[in-house]
């Protein structure tokens, strides 16, 4: 965000914001959060995975969110940013287990000696378990774990109340909307969006720090859009079914006709989630 001074000891980086072409860049997301953009751009990961380095000004402890892909150069860049000013990484947190967020976690733990925490025990290293509502502390910088299932069953967000910021992983993206994965649930996702919309008011959120894409400076407006978009898509799916579509692929051809065909497989996954949600008795 504009206007935040750079702290001493931190390598110079640009602010994370939409570039001229609407893409994210590495740098400061809020006073206590920096992004290191991973070199894994794709239609699904947008500009790449945002690895977040969280630290209280002047503190010696750092928390890192989503080390990202198992890319040695990227992981060492994160180490450089995190260890500036004689700081050390004391915790690693995964917003969910997808490989673009978690594949580098084991190697990053080797480089830093820090444990890896996640809601799903399968992704933990060093027995770092926690539940929704837990408060994580890194040198006085507190983040509250918010369970945000939907994109995946194990998705979480992190409330950085001191900055009015929410780290959203893939629950809310910096550009476009997210896909409901095979282990996710649209019903859970809709409830999550409603809960985050309430949190935006209750916590006075000023910025969303996503797992992909640039930061979002209007949390309430973004969440209102996400909720409206999901409801509109459900209405479109209902209309496609009424018009005779019977399979997810047929629904995609109607509902996502304006979407690049390279994204249709992902759209088909979302349609499956929508059909499950609309099924009688669901």
Residue ranges with predicted function:
Residues 95-101, 151, 212, 274:
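Histidine-centered divalent metal-coordination motifs
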Residues 59-64, 69-71, 142-239:
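Metallo-beta-lactamase
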Residues 7, 239-282:
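C-terminal regulatory/interaction regions
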Residues 42-48, 67-144:
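Active-site HxH/HxHxD metal-binding segment of metal-dependent hydrolases
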Residues 1-16, 21-25:
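Actinobacteria-biased recognition of intrinsically disordered, low-complexity terminal regions
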Residues 113-120, 167-169, 261-263:
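Short hydrophobic/aromatic-enriched beta-strand-loop microsegments
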Residues 22-82, 142, 157-169, 174:
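Conserved beta-strand hairpin/beta-sheet module of binuclear metal-dependent hydrolase folds
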